[in-house]
């Protein structure tokens, strides 16, 4: 039996329509909801049962206001996804699928840039990788924002940890179209399934 899970990377307002808005972000959210709906139907369940049949894990950039990656601190990015702000919130259409235990924060240490959600931790302090193992996950489907950074790093870390990684190409947003295409090509060469 294949044990599947979905990892939703950084579908947060600052990456959708805020300080670091990415290309294709609204479409990525819409397509992610369609994918979740298709999994609900495939499993023969109701919407409220999807989390039991097909766990959905959320990765959340969760920065302190003085994070070292921000331009104001000498970094390369505008301030974004600051903990406790609207920009750091998960898109409202995805909230019915969010649970505290399956939400993992990254970028919390102001001195460390953290693109991958693999080491992000939940409210109990458990890293995402550990939780996926506890769920007996073999196949991880990934969607989110942005292809060239957090999505790619998360996919690569999942692959290194031994999971079969399926990147949902219609459910991702990106900073730059050419960079997005290059990242997809390189991830496919690494063994990540682009679907």
Please report, for each region that a protein language model flagged, where it lies by residue.
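Active-site acidic carboxylates
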Residues: 1-108, 164, 175, 180-194
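Histidine-anchored nucleotide/phosphate-binding helix
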Residues: 34-39, 151-160
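Short, electropositive alpha-helical surface patch
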Residues: 68-81, 111-127, 159
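A short glycine-rich beta-strand->turn/loop micro-motif centered on a GG-aromatic cluster
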Residues: 141-144, 163-177
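Internal catalytic-core helix/loop-beta-alpha segment
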Residues: 91-145
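Gly/Ser/Thr-rich loops at beta-strand to alpha-helix junctions
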Residues: 146-150
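Short, contiguous clusters of charged residues that form electrostatic/catalytic patches at enzyme active sites
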Residues: 30, 34, 123-126, 130, ...
């Amino acid at each position: 039996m294949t044990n599947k899970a979905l990892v939703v990377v950084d579908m947060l307002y600052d990456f959708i329509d805020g300080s670091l808005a990415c290309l294709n972000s609204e479409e990525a959210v819409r397509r992610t909801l369609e994918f979740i709906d298709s999994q609900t139907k495939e499993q023969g369940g109701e919407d409220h049962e999807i989390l039991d049949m097909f766990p959905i894990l959320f990765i959340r950039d969760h920065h302190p206001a003085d994070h070292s990656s921000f331009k104001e601190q000498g970094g390369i990015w505008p301030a974004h996804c600051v903990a406790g702000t609207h920009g750091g919130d998960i898109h409202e259409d995805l909230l019915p699928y969010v649970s505290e235990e399956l939400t993992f924060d990254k970028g919390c240490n102001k001195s460390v840039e953290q693109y991958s959600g693999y080491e992000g931790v939940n409210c109990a302090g458990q890293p995402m990788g550990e939780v996926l193992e506890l769920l007996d996950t073999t196949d991880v489907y990934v969607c989110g924002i942005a292809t060239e950074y957090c999505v790619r790093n998360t996919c690569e870390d999942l692959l290194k940890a031994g999971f079969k990684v399926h990147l949902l190409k219609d459910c991702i947003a990106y900073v730059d179209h050419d960079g997005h295409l290059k990242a997809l090509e390189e991830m496919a060469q690494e063994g990540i399934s682009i679907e």
